[in-house]
Amino acid sequence: VELDNGAYTVKAFYGTNTDAASRTGFYVEGSNSFNLNGETDKSISLTCTPTYGKVKVEFTEMDTYFSDYYVTYSTSALGSSSTAKWSKADTEPWYLKLNNGGETVTATIYLTPKSQYQTKAATVVRTYDLAPNKAWTLQVAPSYNDKTGQLGVSIKIDEGTNDIPVDIVIPSEWV
């Protein structure tokens, strides 16, 4: 591609930036500005990063004490009338559209104990900060006291990730 001298910005993106929450993919983008001043060959690079945050749930031994349990996530992009639901059998993560600087995500845990525990259904609400290109896993496990018969849950957040850089070469005929 031949360009005149001047200032340019290259932008790359992939995915759809319209879904407030998705299980099938997310939007990534990146850009880089550069100047041409008579060079005959110019190589630039840019880094594309997700504009979504990734959330997962790990339920541990919940079937022992609860007949039903699930988590719903709320964000500003989902609005007040919509949530992303993680059912007890789900395994795929949710990708949540977030504000550029990140935002507080509300995780609401719904618990229905088995009848032998003579406890009412409960809801636990937790809020956690999440930024684009970041992830956390909500770890939920039962907490039962044999002596008192109290049934509850233990909740932890794991913010660990396994980042793998991927280099992509764009053929010149695509430009």
Regions flagged by a language model, labelled:
Residues 37-42, 55-58, 70-76:
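Eukaryote-skewed repeat-based solenoidal scaffolds used as protein-protein interaction platforms
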Residues 47-62:
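A short, Gly/Thr-enriched small/hydrophobic beta-strand-prone motif that recurs across taxa
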Residues 2, 29, 39, 58-61, ...:
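Glutamate identity and glutamate-enriched acidic tracts
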Residues 1-19, 67-136, 171-175:
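Tryptophan-paired
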Residues 158-174:
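Short, low-complexity, Pro/Ser/Thr/Gly-rich segments in the mature regions of secreted, periplasmic
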Residues 41, 63-66:
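Short, structured coil/loop segments at alpha-helix boundaries
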Residues 15-51, 113-160:
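Structured interaction patches on ligand/partner-binding surfaces of diverse proteins
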